[in-house]
Regions:
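Gly/Thr-rich phosphate-binding beta-strand-loop-beta motif of the actin/hexokinase/Hsp70
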Residues: 2-37, 83-86, 95
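Short beta-strand-loop/turn "lid" adjacent to the catalytic site in phosphate-handling enzymes
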Residues: 50, 77-101
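Helical "lid/coupling" subdomains associated with nucleotide-phosphate turnover
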Residues: 1-6, 14, 40, 47-48, ...
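Short glycine-rich, Thr/Ser-proximal phosphate-binding strand/loop in the N-terminal lobe
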Residues: 22-56, 100-101
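Short, well-ordered amphipathic alpha-helices
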Residues: 26-29, 66-70
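Amphipathic alpha-helical transducer elements in NTP-driven molecular machines
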Residues: 22, 62-66, 77
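Phosphate/pyrophosphate-binding loops at sites that engage ATP/ADP/AMP, CoA/4′-phosphopantetheine
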Residues: 2, 69-81
């Protein structure tokens, strides 16, 4: 992965967070002039608080999210203020929410 260090304003940065049974992954990127997503950095942590798509230990899950987001921040050099988060499973419901990251 080539290192691209540009100064962006937060609306230009796109951050995805995936909380899964085996890993928690974060990716940081932006849309380039051609409309393609350029990856600036990523983070990955073991998911120890999720089983079969269900969060059974919120503290372990939060710890994994913090590790993944911190790694993505360190690798991308970008401030992460907002994320698009996803978690798959049978018993989830969806709502729009905002809070500290």
């Amino acid at each position: 992965m080539k290192k691209v260090r540009k100064e962006f304003t937060n609306p230009d940065i796109i951050v995805g967070l995936d909380i899964g049974t085996t890993k928690i992954a974060t990716i940081v990127g932006y849309k380039n002039e051609e409309g393609r997503i350029e990856v600036l950095g990523y983070g990955k942590a073991e998911s120890t608080g999720v089983q079969h798509g269900l969060i059974f230990n919120i503290n372990k899950t939060v710890h994994g999210v913090e590790q993944s987001v911190t790694m993505a921040h360190d690798r991308s050099g970008q401030q992460i203020d907002e994320v698009y988060a996803g978690i798959a499973g049978r018993h989830q419901s969806v709502r729009r929410s905002a809070g500290p990251l």
